[in-house]
């Protein structure tokens, strides 16, 4: 497959599920995976024999909890000692370790202990989404737009971009999820005049609210707010914790010590949570949950709402903040658009509706697919698509947090205020604090507090070689330049000497070095090759198994009773039994060994089958092997064993 020019796709890289779409022929297609689902679990599993990504990984999680990784988005761009990371680790069955304060997940893969940065795990999910898109399009694609929560920090944005690089993607843009959802809401709705739209995006792990003014294809973000650690996973955790105690009281056993039991309970709780969006009660039935004890219980919607009451109210504070920042009143919002799977929860809808004085909520877009839809549109625009409905479409996004530097006394001096439209550039003159100061330390921070100690350090660099001068005389010009992806470049110039230095804020806190990225790209290629080899091995095994069983079944059937001698029948049955026995005793055989066994089996079978065929065998040929494979393995010029589609 070769990649044609001008094609790109949009990926919603979610905490719990991911989604991919492509814009072509004037419309967006949300692409289904090979199981027919339009969303794919953001899960990666490692076993003794292979790596699994997506649904196959999630489906085996209760059997292999400690080696199945999910929630990578909650780790990406964070420090190991972040309070949210430490809190999450109590709920995760897989192990998280520290590598110079960067979190890494530790798993057992093919008998060895392996550690992966969250960027690497996310890149594996991105590889899966890339493969889904390529299977649909029929050719290779590397250009992509990836979405992130609007309230993500600079380091988390850069780490997401790194994950794209590791997945072999050319990341055209990092787009905020609510902005992408707004495109999905408004595309093809031109000519309605200026609208103030509030996007309420509550997913599996993050919450975002953005207020946009949409007018004739121009999407201008007025304000954004959110919580990068609030979503469906937290609701699941509440329900899991709720059921721990009754089990312990009744049976005097603590299931929290058993990762498999906890994982099975979590899966059941997630299912119950979904049921409670449409029913007032849900049953939980788990056979032999722990030490042979069955766990049968139920939960009402009212009890679930009570368990999560504070979490359900949590999004309202960011909504108020966004309204204040946008300088808009509730009544000035024309549409309240729901995005993200967790907005299906009736109580969340009720709280939001009450907040807006009973206003009708807009549920016109698919909450699971809207973000990928908008990302696909933006990808097409960036690739120069000339479709009529994309003409004059323009995104004007904002910086979610204030950006500044530390000045004397640890004061945060802001250069770019939060909710400033990006891309943007701001320049300010600074000077020295003491006489004959030879250099200055530029420390870049992100946050809203007055003192830098309460904000997040993004990066720092020194500007040295300043000529001796009294304090306050040197003029140091500092420029903050933030691009459309929300990634910041900071430069400083001493105006008298011309000395300068600069930094791209990619944040050491969770940021990978260039060398680490190069190493991981090579490892990703190796894992991809391993996956392909495993697929080929399984295919060879399945083909051999199919031929052996089908051949045995055919010659033992009534149709051939009068057509084949007892001696020939015995030869084929014995060889088939021998092959089946070999497979049972050689579960870890390589692809070449399976292919050799297939050739040996076909040597015995083909001459007898050819003789029968020439004699007019009824009922057709037994199925199981592709024609190409059979021809390779046959010394006969007779007919081959064909696979039935």
From Swiss-Prot:
This is Heat shock 70 kDa protein. Keywords: ATP-binding, Nucleotide-binding, Stress response. The gene is HSP70. Belongs to the heat shock protein 70 family. PANTHER family: HEAT SHOCK PROTEIN 70KDA. It comes from Pleurodeles waltl. Residues 623-636 have a biased composition (Low complexity). NCBIfam families: PRK00290.1. Signal peptide: none annotated. PROSITE patterns: HSP70_1, HSP70_2, HSP70_3. Residues 615-645 are annotated as: Disordered. One of its GO terms (molecular function) is ATP-dependent protein folding chaperone. It holds the Pfam family HSP70.
